[in-house]
């Protein structure tokens, strides 16, 4: 299991060691199981550049507290709110973010309604010019995270909110090495399942 702050050179070397020398595929970069679709890099990066936050006119936070997880991002959201008076929604109450936001519910059924275009927030996303939906890591730990993430991506794509000029779906990583590890394909669901089930005799950290 690779660490949260491991640089890419070390990640690459460890992968080469395990795969080519030890002939072992039991390698993962996640300390806990989270949903990742690494078929495309856009599925696990923050697609909206920080500098483009101010162009947004609607933000939906899903399982994230940007004030604690990404302070620079949070300050940009605050700046955009003050400048554009944009609407901000959160799937749950995450406390004081230094700007007002509307709490939908902590129940994932509400997010399912948004995905199915059966919620008022669905209409707001569709009518927005540059909406942003930010998935945090806690949302990606849910048993239903795969359905929710892929469903949201499908909803945004069908309504032209994911296109060559704007990708409304972003993933906020908590750790410095996460994206690099995913780029190197250091992911294996069977491995992390076996680690969590204590099936290995030796775990190399």
Annotate each language-model stretch with its function:
Residues 1-205:
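Catalytic alpha/large subunits of respiratory electron-transfer oxidoreductases
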């Amino acid at each position: 299991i690779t660490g949260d702050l491991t640089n890419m050179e070390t990640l690459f070397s460890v992968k080469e060691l395990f795969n080519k020398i030890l002939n072992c595929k039991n390698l993962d970069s996640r300390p806990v199981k989270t949903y990742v679709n690494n078929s495309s890099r856009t599925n696990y990066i923050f697609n909206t550049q920080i500098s483009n936050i101010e162009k947004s006119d609607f933000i939906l936070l899903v399982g994230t507290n940007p004030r604690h997880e990404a302070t620079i991002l949070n300050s940009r959201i605050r700046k955009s709110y003050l400048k554009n008076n944009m609407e901000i929604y959160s799937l749950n109450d995450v406390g004081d973010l230094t700007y007002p936001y509307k709490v939908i519910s902590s129940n994932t059924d509400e997010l399912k309604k948004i995905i199915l275009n059966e919620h008022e927030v669905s209409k707001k996303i569709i009518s927005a010019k540059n909406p942003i939906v930010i998935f945090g890591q806690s949302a990606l730990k849910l048993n239903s995270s795969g359905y929710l993430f892929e469903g949201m991506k499908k909803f945004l794509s069908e309504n032209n909110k994911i296109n060559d000029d704007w990708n409304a779906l972003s993933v906020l990583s908590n750790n410095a090495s996460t994206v690099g590890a995913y780029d190197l394909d250091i992911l294996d669901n069977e491995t992390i399942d076996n680690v969590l089930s204590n099936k290995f005799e030796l775990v190399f950290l």
